[in-house]
Amino acid sequence: MVSLLKKLIGSRNDRLLKQYRKLVTQINNLEPQIAALSDEALQAKTQEFRDRHAKGTSLDDLLPEAFAVVREAGKRVFGMRHFDAQLLGGIALHNGKIAEMRTGEGKTLMATLPVYLNAIAAKGVHVVTVNDYLARRDADWMGRLYRFLGMSTGVVVPQQPNEEKIAAYRADITYGTNNEFGFDYLRDNMEYRVEDRRQRGLAYAIVDEVDSILIDEARTPLIISGQAEDHTELYVRMNAVPPLLKRMAGEPKPHEPEPEGDYWVDEKSQQVHLSESGHESAEKILTRLGILPEGESLYDPRHIALMHHMMVALRAHTLFFLDQQYVIQDGEVVIVDEFTGRLMAGRRWSDGLHQAVEAKEGVKIQHENQTLASITFQNYFRMYEKLSGMTGTADTEAYEFQEIYSLETVIIPTNKPMQRKDQNDQVFRTSQEKYNAILNDIRDCHERGQPVLVGTTSIENSELLSGLLKKAKLPHEVLNAKQHAREAEIVAEAGKPGHITIATNMAGRGTDIVLGGSVEKQIDLIRADENLSEAEKTARIERVRQEWKPLNEQVKAAGGLRIIGTERHESRRIDNQLRGRAGRQGDPGSSRFYLSLEDPLMRIFAGDRVRAIMERLKLPEGEPIEAGMVTRSIETAQRKVEGRNFDIRKQLLEYDDVANDQRKVLYAQRNDVLEAKTIGASVENLRDAAVTELFRGFVPAESVEEQWDIAGLQQALASDWQLQLPLAEMVEAEPKLTDEELLERVLQAARDTYRSKSELVGEESWGQFERSIMLQSIDTHWREHLSALDYLRQGIHLRGYAQKNPKQEYKREAFELFSGMLDRIRDDVVRVLMTVRVQSTEQVAQAEAEAAQSHVQNVQFHHSDYDEALASEAAEAQEPVRNVLPKVGRNDACPCGSGKKYKQCHGKLT
């Protein structure tokens, strides 16, 4: 019935494309008129559009003309004309949707259409890329078109001086990575001066490779952290425990005897669980090693941290392996991203896991970190007024984009029909049989002059395959995290005749593989040669292109690019991304995945079913199954994994939404403090509320004198706020004194004491001091609150055993924690301001600078691929920033990481 309706009225995608094609017709009709304009007249269109928009013309109404102008500018600047398919994609992006376009269809050029149109509003457009190389490349490349049309571009990258970053955000169009945009948002909410903030609002963002950023990286929050308590010795001692515990043969099953052993590993959830006997064994081992005192239990409240450290050590030994999840580089454990295979310099696992892995590998253990600020990509990108994205593979995750981000996916038809042939998977019994078949396929392609791209899921597998190819004397390139610096160069050469390239997952994404090899690098070198005249440059470029044509034809005749997958990823989308490297813009190509029953995905999710099929068919050794049924069975397993991962992300989001609501409230209050001309009235309200609450603790409202604890109140006022008041004498001297009158006298005494301090140092200096103390208190208590929320979340699932809804309990308790935090901020601010002894303006300035410095000590930034570029640019980026504050000179860089001199940043707070 549903398919019949689709035939009659078309799918939602068909109906959207039908609407968009009407706009494409309008744009095409404008082409001759726009083409007739001179360069000056074309450039003047930008100001004309801005004037019309300021007078009320909507961006939707400007779209046909603006897109026609960009298309014409593209022809004049690049010699490239936007295809109709790119216009369709541009319209989808402007309408806040995800445009799915095949690899090689020109997503980068397509983005110029909605970017230009939305930049007319002068609110700033953010173009989000997956790495710094692509951000710089696209800003430089597309910037030529924007500058031709009179628009400014900027790019934000790690370790950029603050002045440059602010200028980049003030540009009409800003390029950068998802990490940098997110971190800058967090940094802006940690600043002590309005003028140091970078971003000017979140109006419109286009996210390139949107599936990678909004789905693959959505489980990892962005975290700015500082050093916490040192547990180095405990990690080293706890590292001796896992080898002494015995792993069980399998997971215990209900109503069956528990297998012998101390623990089992759940590979699906990436967790380790102790058995009943395992708990006893662990206590004995910890006691024997002197970690747990004799006769005491691991479950005593004071030993709960030991349990956590032991489980982390177990996970490090059983679930995290060298050259799979991490590598050792320069004596440090560096994480390998599971989706891209890239090294994540600067990123560290949390909850002590990174330290446990360091202890396992015998490298220097670095300090644990305390979270200073944190946000997930889901919550960061949902703050944009309008969000859109582009990718080659979004359709498999369309439901999640709609559910989480309210983003609809529009599949854009290819400019030319796709010719790639996707062959059925071949499944072997063992890895050895699988690799033999892969070698035979690669050898055949190499001999026929067909380029091959082999996709692996880990560095270990890529190096294993590389070793096999070396033995077979087959020349090849390896593209994994260890060769990241040469990534673009290796990818550019991957299309040459007979070339063999091994790539870890989707390393090299964003650079096209051109059949016959890329000539762009040679052309760029010719263009940059100042010794050549324009005529000589043109002649040489033409010669290079002519030499490339026979190579291109040779590769096409051999069948185009051959894609070989050595394993299925747990996400169909990652497999599709690998396949999508072949068959660009109507080129020929083919793909095949080789699998074995020993592959992790097959072993965990689909192995039993496929093994049963192989046994029934009685296939000889080395003979694979190759059938659509098997491929479908594997895809069913992948759907299960995708569904589970979606549930995990959705559940994480539901919990993070609680923290996000609190973050919005706190950051809004912090910004009010930062932006207000004076916060004296706010401080007065806080002080009066704090005094009243303290007073009512000793003198209840509407109570009689016999219920009053005047001695206790007098002592509390003196110790908490240094208010020396003869309250007992007042009450004795005035028998008719009411509690309200007494409260008013206490409030007035507090006001008088406070005013005297303000008058002593001057209103302006005191106002700055108030602001600094308020900001410091907010930041300190927010850090503690984030840690409290983490602990709450880790144990909240246990409420399910008490027949309570863990999510509801988390919301309720998180709200109580937040309310308590706001009260502590108030009390802290009032206590400091009431008890501080001031004698001069200089002392206030010194206290204020110290407050700011304590806030910015030992700052680090964490996320999956943050600081990739820094791994090659600056080795110190991998080390925590350890500033010894008294040594910061006035002309040194400020410890806050802003890039400014100390005297121009936190050294200048007064």
From Swiss-Prot:
Listed SUPFAM superfamilies: Helical scaffold and wing domains of SecA, P-loop containing nucleoside triphosphate hydrolases, Pre-protein crosslinking domain of SecA
Reaction(s) this enzyme catalyzes, per UniProt: ATP + H2O + cellular proteinSide 1 = ADP + phosphate + cellular proteinSide 2
Known EC number: 7.4.2.8
Biological process, per Gene Ontology: intracellular protein transmembrane transport; protein import; protein targeting; protein transport by the Sec complex
GO molecular function ontology, one term from the record: ATP binding
GO cellular component, one term: plasma membrane
Keywords from the UniProt entry: ATP-binding, Cell inner membrane, Cell membrane, Cytoplasm, Membrane, Metal-binding, Nucleotide-binding, Protein transport, Translocase, Translocation, Transport, Zinc
Binding annotation for Zn(2+): C894, C896, C905, H906
Bilayer topology: Peripheral membrane protein
Cofactor note: May bind 1 zinc ion per subunit.
Localization annotation: Cell inner membrane; Cytoplasm
CDD domains from the UniProt entry: DEXDc_SecA (cd17928), SF2_C_secA (cd18803)
Cofactor(s) named in the record: Zn(2+)
Binding site for ATP: Q86, G104, E105, G106, K107, T108, D512
One Pfam assignment: SecA_PP_bind
Chief place where the protein resides: membrane
Recorded family membership: Belongs to the SecA family.
Subunit structure: Monomer and homodimer. Part of the essential Sec protein translocation apparatus which comprises SecA, SecYEG and auxiliary proteins SecDF-YajC and YidC.
Function noted in UniProt: Part of the Sec protein translocase complex. Interacts with the SecYEG preprotein conducting channel. Has a central role in coupling the hydrolysis of ATP to the transfer of proteins into and across the cell membrane, serving both as a receptor for the preprotein-SecB complex and as an ATP-driven molecular motor driving the stepwise translocation of polypeptide chains across the membrane.
PANTHER family: CHLOROPLAST PROTEIN-TRANSPORTING ATPASE, SECA INNER MEMBRANE COMPONENT OF SEC PROTEIN SECRETION SYSTEM
NCBIfam families: PRK12904.1, secA
The protein's name: Protein translocase subunit SecA 1
